[in-house]
Amino acid sequence: MSKVIGIDLGTTNSCVAIMDGSQPKVIENSEGARTTPSIVAFTDSERLVGQPAKRQAVTNPSNTVFAVKRLIGRRTTDAEVEKDKKLVPYAIVDGGNGDAWVEVRGDKYSPSQISAFILQKMKETAESYLGEPVTQAVITVPAYFNDAQRQATKDAGKIAGLEVLRIINEPTAAALAYGLDKKDSKTIAVYDLGGGTFDITILEIDDGLFEVKSTNGDTFLGGEDFDMRIVNYLADEFKKEHGVDLTKDKMALQRLKEAAEKAKIELSSSSQTEINQPFISMDKDSGTPLHMVMKLTRAKLESLVGDLIKRTMKPVQDALKDAGMSKGDIDEIVLVGGMTRMPKVVEEVTAFFGKEPHKGVNPDEVVALGAAIQAGVLQGDVKDVVLLDVTPLSLGIETLGGVFTRLIDRNTTIPTKKSQIFSTAEDNQNAVTIRVFQGEREMAADNKLLGQFNLENIPPAPRGMPQIEVTFDIDANGIVSVSAKDKGTGKEQKITIQASGGLSDDEIDRMVKDAEANAEADKQRKELVEAKNQAESLIHTTKKSLEEHGDKVDGSTVEAIELAVGALEEALKSEDAGKIKGGIQNLMDASMKLGEAIYKASQAEAGTGDAEGEAGPRDVDDEIVDADFEDLGEDKRK
């Protein structure tokens, strides 16, 4: 049975882990790094994922997609998407059903599809390490993701060729990794500030039982926002000094973004850093190049992002309130996500809880490790671990007057199922539309519409008489199914919620086929590169051998080798791996006689050497060296 892998699909970076014996282990990617940038780029000839995509972002900003997790499961009309459109250099467009998609080089991609490219890279990383195919995974999502975002993440897994056995909340995964070997009873708060999202989760841990008491957060608050504050500051300062607006230049903006991220990281360990960006623009009058050389202090950074850090504290307070706890009830605070390396974040958390956070986990890797543990639980490799998670937002339906009627309250332990009886609003009403919402507002329209369906052919009856039972069912992934049943006739209508846009099964199948086709194209491209490398190496060594040993074979053999070299050089121009491999084989066959001649010649030389060595016995005296010795005596020896 193949391994189930654990994947932390992050906004900025992603990470993959497996269970290695009784402990989870992070797997390094092909570049030797333990995390992979969640970036996908499209060039004229290929698709790049991870570090190669990040490296070329400055020169190809419009076709380099990053932070796509912020778009997953969202509509183009969402305020967050409108905000994102102004910040990113790539195009965010309507996918045709109101969903936010991205457009690159004239092609549209859903956020699930872009995420699938990243998941494929994670899958390949695991397969390369394990030496066997991987088909199943546990994937993490922010705890505060709604149903549409969870469903879209599951779709991404399917497109990548993975069966997603479980969607697990990131803070819960972190708690699993933190508490795996801990036997004592503790109440912990997981403060997770990542690249694009923020979560706070309160859990009770007791000898293998992990029970989530409450969760809260903000799915549009993270390191990307911190970076943009620095970018805007740098652009404003440059405009004041040179009168040039760098935000209008996509390439300059991408350079600023990279510089901002680097400066932010450096300021976690030093009090000052220099931002040096030569030739970032041109003076519009004189045409002379303009350079950015600027110092940024930690104090200035903290003043730029102070309100963002403060914003995390409201969800923390709400989570404690929902759990029925006070700050003093928390035994340990676990910090997760790269942004928790920032000293000001640690300072704010310490000030709020009145105690130092736990620093024993790697904030970049702990979520993937937890996902691997959950994978181990599902596979039966990890025993005595029970995880009880919660739904982050209330679920309900729209009733008369547009009111949001809750069926399942937020922070209800999942999986769960709940039913309620409703009736018709008018006499002889023969159909009802069930509109399903998720959120905390009192009016349905202010919450997130997850989907809708109709229950039809209700027998004519006075208003209030028919009994319609609406049942909500949330599985362990936090994904919702809703059914409506007319108790009089037994008629039932049921749906698994798909975002009011969402990807249809046909679209997912098309994307799966597209991903498979791309995987085949990638494989062929790799084969071509490897064949070219082998051919060039063989040509070089053959030519060198001919120069040194050509005189050891007859002229016809030399001519055959030179013809084979020429044919292989010609094949190299064709970009056809099959032709190149054929040329390699021909040259190897032609060179065989040369190899035999070289081998025979070296053997003959070795034989001659031995014969010379045995020509006569050496005079023993030849090896003797005369030397004078002085007797030190006892005193001198001391």
UniProtKB/Swiss-Prot annotation:
GO molecular function term, any single one: unfolded protein binding
UniProt xrefs under NCBIfam families: PRK00290.1, PRK05183.1, prok_dnaK
Lineage of origin: Bacteria, Pseudomonadati, Pseudomonadota, Alphaproteobacteria, Rhodobacterales
Residues annotated with Phosphothreonine modification: T197
Name of the gene this protein is made from: dnaK
Top-level lineage group: Bacteria
Protein name, UniProt field: Chaperone protein DnaK
Family: Belongs to the heat shock protein 70 family.
Cited PANTHER family: HEAT SHOCK PROTEIN 70KDA (PTHR19375)
Function: Acts as a chaperone.
Chain positions covered by the region annotation Disordered: 603-638
Keywords noted in UniProt: ATP-binding, Chaperone, Nucleotide-binding, Phosphoprotein, Stress response
Expression induction: By stress conditions e.g. heat shock.
InterPro entries: ATPase_NBD, Chaperone_DnaK, Heat_shock_70_CS, HSP70_C_sf, HSP70_peptide-bd_sf, Hsp_70_fam
